[in-house]
């Protein structure tokens, strides 16, 4: 008779968000990455106003090639696996592009 023991490890996700800076000029390119660690590999999703914007396994990125004032706001990164769920937030601030021709 053969006895076997298996140990299954599970670790709830932990999130790390890379965003420098948090303020951007309208029209610039922006990329914000949310990375999560955990066992098993977590699913990562970005949300704004409860609408999913991006998803991936272990990482998900918010990418704006031409950020607009309407992109301004609070975004939520959520990571989950069988061991748990966690979330973190980032505030995206978009400033108007200064145009010298508008100055009188």
Regions found by a protein language model. Give the residues of each.
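Immunoglobulin-superfamily
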Residues: 1-104
